[in-house]
């Protein structure tokens, strides 16, 4: 019978992008790493974009080619957002791209190589979204790169996606350097059991032998002269090895890509599975369950019936979706009970009892303004050590990464994946005694 006690170098709490990046960075440094998680995290809900930084200084009509690159955009965010993690880590922003390349390289089966500039990928709601990189199955739909007409596809009789709405997003950014576009409906999935099929069901059907090829032939029959690429709903397979987009493209004769996903998200599950596979291949042990009775490094913590003792901890447990921040009378970090603070705005003064205030009192009427509640989290120093209410380091071998770190709103400010990768990479290296 195996021992119930695990001794390791690094315990990572949380299994989303920040936690996985931290674990893989620590593992690369030779550390024995254990991940403890309650659930997969918000990474499995992602729509396919890896958002790192978009230029805060550009105007809406600034052409794609004139916008700042990803790292320069992060520097501009650091200069204008005093509570943002990029501002806190501004002296190390020259390593941001190392972190992004590391994380995307670890997940290269799913993620396209980053180029240094933002790609512009359509959303299902008719917007063009900037992303430092995206799924490989989406890269062919980069609005800044398509030369010719972009064919925006939906499925005849299926109510899940509106190609006219999606194509309208491409038309709006055409003056910025985007392509002409036109919507079409493909005669697929019309029989009763598939006309209301869930995205995951459609993705599995397209993986079947011959299915992607037939879909490519259906697409080819409706193409016109000048059509340069096609984007479809984000259902082009769950398994990257099925190569659904590539198989379709061979038959269609033009590049085939997906647009971004809403929930439920096939790309999110695809990315989650890639993370799982990479952690297993790297030798990271994953324990399912809450961390209980854990007081920090060198002390035993109970995780899913196992006792874990680690020299260093990385808190990468997320915020509200991931469960890293809880409200039990007041906002608290859920593992070590660390204080939750606002990082900017009227509640940034540590003397204000921010965490105990009613939620309605820590939101702002202006929806475009930074929201104190949605950006709440741990306050950290420039080494990513969590701080207590008096601004003191909680423990020199406890680090924080990802959404549990306050000062940014991953859902709205366009830096969620970037903060996760950057802080995860830095925290993982530091936890393994490989200072970045």
Give the predicted meaning of each segment.
Residues 285-287, 309-316, 320-406:
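A glycine-rich dinucleotide-binding beta-alpha-beta segment and adjacent secondary-structure elements
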Residues 10-13, 34-36, 291-292, 307-320:
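Short hydrophobic core segments
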Residues 83-84, 140-160, 180-183, 192-201, ...:
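Helix-loop-beta segment of a Rossmann-like dinucleotide-binding subdomain
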Residues 166-174, 209-231, 237-292:
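Helical element adjacent to the flavin cofactor pocket in flavoenzyme catalytic cores
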Residues 85-151, 264-301:
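Feature captures the FAD/FMN-dependent oxidoreductase FAD-binding
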Residues 24, 47, 322-334, 395-396, ...:
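A conserved FAD-binding loop/helix module that cradles the flavin
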Residues 9-35, 424:
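N-terminal Rossmann-like FAD-binding beta1-loop-alpha1 element of flavoenzymes
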Residues 38-78, 191-203:
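Conserved N-terminal glycine-rich FAD pyrophosphate-binding loop of Rossmann-like flavoproteins
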